[in-house]
């Protein structure tokens, strides 16, 4: 744990250092204002200006600074109406939502008043005003969305969203001439994004009849020439120009397109999901700037040829923050996402020896099993990672190791635990928690007979709200996990399963329409959080699902997503570094979920400051109460003091991000963890369980009679045997 903390501290230092270095960098706007994000950007000369929620920021010569402080406008950014109070109105008027430039001057636009400002010397100076009807649709009383903004040849180009509720996807290009104050609307339809052009008024991307980027002439209102057609589902984000060539971002790559339509990969940016409407900019020196959340990525595209970075191709999904932070710490390695997440295509890529895929993130149970069993995964011989992997819960080790060889590392864990509202359960004196389905049905009977009328806002268990087919599906899933053998065979023609189905049939009246229960469940059949979470001060406590029969050990079934390396990859050393990085930087909760050795509680980062503020406010109220002589005012202060004390008690419930009690409860449950990753009937990544579910729906959609149990079992067995034969 000490090592992890040291690494995290080092990472913060590295991020700060990298963000202000020359070359390819990632500016982090939270370094100048907490919670800041980049909304809009443009270059004026060699200075990059970025508009965020709280200000306009400038980056020049490796220095990031605040150019204009707009933090007082934060509360008014989405207020469409001008406040009546003049002080508030003066702040509202400067709540700009976009910045743009003519190459010499920086401008900002207020999206509701239509006021255009010059941004100079740390201030917003009114410059000109858009006609009201450009942005405001009077007939339907709403403001049009501004999807794109750029300026060229003295004209402001605004790509606007729909002007009527019947055509939600409609866009319209409005052109405002600064000199004449005239407004023109383009007749071109299907425009999705715009950018400042070179040798033309504008670059537009249309997605109407064709997926095409055009050079646009405002005087003729025509697309003069085609820049390029895009294939398939590709869409350009962050369009800009550099030395007469189009530059845009798609699929983690910054492309440069020449006049013949040929494109080169000039750089990589760790953004998996790019929006067409995202604006970008490129300086005269060839530094391309692309915003994403709190970061602005700068990439030098001035060098000849394509990027020489080591590129790892990942098939699967990881946290976007993980990719961003890895790229900052390892600028020489780019991780890009493959186009598909389809499990069969993952296996096909491995089977064919496709060396273009370096990394997989696959599910267990699911695609992981075939990759492991058929030898498609590379050994991960990173010593520190292997040592760490051997400290994980045994059920996880059983999945990721092949003997002593590490084949992958878990990056997320999905648990099939249940949850009980411990607070209300104890308040209602409901006794012991049920540990078998028979006990659960008995508890439901007692609830319906003795509690339901008195507690209409609650119900005993959510299985009362899912129908017999949902209940049987849950039981079958647990039965398969417990009884499927190593070859993938499972028989439902057993006394255990037959008795259980008979029990369901005998108790189906509990789930009949006359016993419908739609209050908040005291027992929920899903995982709500690590150990203990809170809902309106009620303690929601993790519990193990009931067993199928009395005397059985309660178990905790789980699925994991495993990051692993393709045996065909030619970049395995870089891939190992990425896996090790991800393992080291998993989110805190996942670290606790997979490591039994992590037992130190974690205090909430906001707890102390919040508690100090509330206690200070309470002391002020108590002082005022002690000095107050007016009885009526004292009564009011008493109410305020009581309310403040309740707030303090509520905050104290949230003292811990990870509490000692949560750790104890989770570790006790996780000792019974099993991951049936070899199952042919897993509900994650296999058709086998889907076929069983179809049988259950056929026989149980309207309930289950005892006379139907044999037929249900026969059909489940038939499907189970068929799945077994297909896999052998």
Spans of features found by a protein language model:
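Conserved N-terminal structural module of periplasmic/extracytoplasmic solute-binding proteins
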Residues: 22-23, 27, 31-42, 49-50, ...
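Extracytoplasmic/periplasmic solute-binding protein
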Residues: 407-411, 416, 439-491, 515-523
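Glycine-centered hinge/linker elements that transmit conformational signals in sensory
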Residues: 444, 473-515, 536-548
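Extracytoplasmic/periplasmic substrate-recognition and gating elements
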Residues: 534-612, 623-632
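Conserved C-terminal helix/tail region of periplasmic/extracytoplasmic solute-binding proteins
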Residues: 290-292, 605-728
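Hinge/lid segment of periplasmic solute-binding proteins
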Residues: 365-417, 541-545
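Extracytoplasmic "Venus flytrap"/periplasmic binding protein-like
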Residues: 332-392, 426-428, 519-520, 530-535
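Surface-exposed loop and turn segments in beta-propeller and other repeat-based domains
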Residues: 68-90, 128-142, 271-272
